[in-house]
Swiss-Prot record:
Gene name as annotated: Defb15
GO biological process: defense response to bacterium; innate immune response
Record localization: Secreted
Protein name: Beta-defensin 15
Keywords on record: Antibiotic, Antimicrobial, Defensin, Disulfide bond, Secreted, Signal
């Protein structure tokens, strides 16, 4: 009986720490915890209470951080 009470106490106190870990992981990737992801979002992690951590998918194409190859003299390979 003492073993059961000990295990119950350990699991009871570890549960909030585990849930905080999942929420922290989601905020690190700039996600949001929600019941379901939108069309332009992808599931990247799990949050507490069976919620999903969703992050907006970046659209394909040129981004501000990538430099254009125009004028660089680099010829891309085709095929």
């Amino acid at each position: 009986m003492k073993t059961f009470l000990f295990l119950f106490a350990v699991l009871f106190f570890l549960d909030p720490a585990k849930n905080a870990f999942f929420d922290e992981k989601c905020s690190r990737v700039n996600g949001r915890c929600t019941a379901s992801c939108l069309k332009n979002e992808e599931l990247v992690a799990l949050c507490q209470k069976n919620l999903k951590c969703c992050v907006t998918v970046q659209p394909c194409g040129k981004s501000k951080s990538n430099q254009s190859d125009e004028g660089s003299g680099h010829m891309g390979t085709w095929g």
